[in-house]
Structures are given as C-alpha cells and as structure tokens.
C-alpha cells in the first residue's frame, strides 16, 4: 500500500493543485489529509476536488475546518472522516482524532480532554496509523525555531498506545519525520513548498517497517 499524506491545504487552489499533481506523480492507494483541509468557510469545494481524485481520502478536522466537516465528508463517496473511528484500507488500520491544541493558537475545537483521550485509546493499537492535526509536544512542533506548540496530551497518548505511525501537520515550519519511542511521527504539512509525505507498506509482509519520505 502506498500512502500519500498531506496537511494544511487550507482550501487554497494552488495547494489543491499540488495535491492533485502529487497523486498523479506518485500513484498512491490512499490520500490522508491531516487537518486544515478547508478554511473558515464550507469545505465542500475542496472535498469535491479531492473526491474527484478517484482514490480513498481519509481525513480529520483541524483548527480551520468547520464543525460540520464530518457531515460534509459523508456527501462524497471517496471521503472518509476518521474522527474517533478505525478504518482499514488493504488490511492496514487507520484511526483519527479531529481537533487541535488550544494554545498558543486560538481554535474553535480542541480534542485533548481526558475523556476524549480515554476513548481514543480504545481504537489505537500497535499497528494503527493514527491521523491527527497537531504534532505531539516536543516533536516537529517548533514555531519560529524555538517555541514548542505541540500537544502534551497527544504525547501521552502515543506513549501509552504506541501506534505504528502518527501523521500530523498544523506547524507549517517544522515538517519532517522523527521517532517517539517505537512510533514514527510525520509532520506532512504542505503549507510551504512541500508536497507532503509518501509512505510505502509491504502488502505481502504487513509487519515490515514501512519506507517513508518527504516529497
């Protein structure tokens, strides 16, 4: 399975076109959008464009996505909202949590509350590809090169559940890949010049370590 992960499209035509080109160039089996797919208006237009790509698109809501993100996603045959659910593609389990950290950026939705984290732990296992919007605290979360703006709640969740991979965005200027224990964390924001991340899994040997790269 080839996964193409992006975040922070913000409904910008140029970034939608960048994703379209990425799908054409890399021929992924699934597109992951790790939040801020839309902006502060109706996400229908960007979802419509992504739906036309002809591959499954799994998505979570970020801080600039409207509260009706999940409802709008249901209108499109190729779009799946991952919020608080597990979804398998080619046998590989995905799970997601919508929302973002409350500080230092203002946002209309935060998922890092104790009860939500407890519920999320129930859908995350060691093979899970977890899709969230913010990075964990201290990992790929630097703003202006010095301020950590990630989530401490997510960091604790990763330590407790040890998912296989975390795909995130939110911090535009700190894209990359890093390990948190046994978990590979990828900040796949495309808000600057990047195309996101490509991750290749072995269908014949699902337990084999995936090959990931930024593009």
Give residue spans per PLM region.
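Active-site neighborhood of phospho(di)ester-bond hydrolases with catalytic His/Asp-centered motifs
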Residues: 5-8, 31-36, 57-63, 81-83, ...
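Binuclear metal-dependent phosphoesterase catalytic core
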Residues: 86-90, 155-161, 174-215
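Active-site-proximal beta-strand elements of phosphoester/diester hydrolases
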Residues: 1-10, 91-100, 129-133, 184-189, ...
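N-terminal active-site segment of His-dependent metallophosphoesterases
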Residues: 1-52, 123-125
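Active-site environment of divalent metal-dependent phosphoester hydrolases
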Residues: 10-15, 38-42, 63-70, 102-105, ...
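Conserved catalytic scaffold of divalent metal-dependent phosphoesterases
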Residues: 58, 65-153
């Amino acid at each position: 399975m080839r996964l193409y992960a992006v975040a922070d499209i913000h409904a910008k035509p140029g970034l939608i076109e960048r994703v379209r080109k990425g799908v054409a160039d890399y021929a992924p089996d699934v597109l992951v959008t790790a939040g801020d797919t839309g902006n502060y208006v109706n996400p229908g237009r960007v979802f419509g464009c992504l739906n036309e790509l002809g591959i499954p698109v799994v998505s979570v809501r970020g801080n600039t996505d409207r509260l009706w993100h999940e409802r709008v996603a249901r209108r499109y045959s190729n779009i799946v909202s991952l919020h608080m659910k597990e979804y398998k593609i080619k046998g590989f389990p995905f799970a997601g949590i919508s929302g973002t950290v409350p500080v230092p950026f203002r946002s209309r939705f935060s998922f890092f509350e104790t009860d939500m984290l407890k519920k999320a732990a129930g859908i995350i296992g060691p093979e899970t590809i977890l899709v969230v919007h913010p990075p964990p605290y201290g990992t790929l979360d630097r703003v202006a090169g010095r301020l950590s703006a990630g989530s401490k709640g997510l960091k604790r969740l990763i330590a407790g559940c040890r998912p296989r991979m975390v795909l995130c965005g939110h911090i535009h200027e700190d894209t990359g890949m890093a390990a948190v224990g046994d978990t590979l964390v990828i900040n796949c924001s495309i808000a600057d010049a990047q195309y996101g991340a490509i991750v290749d899994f072995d269908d014949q040997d699902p337990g084999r370590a995936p090959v990931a790269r930024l593009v």
